[in-house]
Design a protein with these regions (language model features):
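DUTPase catalytic domain/fold
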Residues: 1-152
Length: 152
């Protein structure tokens, strides 16, 4: 099954990711609240923008999170790793219920406003391959590094 879900901490109706057109490869993600992204200072953690969404992927798939092409020019928002990779075992993550976040650096000198319902970026489902003698058998025990940064 490949599907988006609302995370448990969200009680209100939120917009789940959706494709804008029939030929869109990515699903648009939306901010669940108004936030202000402060200007980046060297050494700052990236600013986390909540989506309120988790994703279930099929085996040998991941969801790639990418920035909107207009964000760097219009809002001066860049993603620190260029992309985000959401593995199948991140679903139901005990640290945050598998909620996905978009991480940004604001490279302007002024705070940037993101409004509730505004498009943040896109998620693109991707297949991946494994080597023939792959022996990975571990399980995800915790979330990723940013579970410590949720308070921005």
């Amino acid at each position: 099954m490949r599907k988006f879900f609302k995370v448990k901490r969200i009680n209100e109706d939120i917009k789940l990711p959706e494709r804008s057109t029939r030929n869109s490869s990515g699903y648009d993600f939306f901010a669940i609240e108004d936030v202000e992204v402060p200007p980046y200072k060297f050494g700052d953690n990236p600013f986390m923008v909540a989506t309120g969404v988790k994703v279930k992927t099929e085996e040998n798939e991941f969801l790639m999170l990418v920035n909107r092409s207009s964000n760097p020019k219009k809002k001066k928002l860049i993603m620190p790793n260029s992309i985000g990779v959401i593995d199948a075992d991140y679903f139901e993550n005990p640290d945050n219920d598998g909620e996905m976040f978009f991480t940004f650096y604001n490279v302007s000198n002024e705070p940037v406003q993101i409004k509730k319902g505004e498009k943040l970026g896109q998620g693109i489902f991707m297949k991946y391959l494994k080597i023939d003698d792959d022996t990975a058998n571990g399980e995800r025990k915790r979330g990723v590094w940013f579970h410590r940064c949720l308070k921005n």
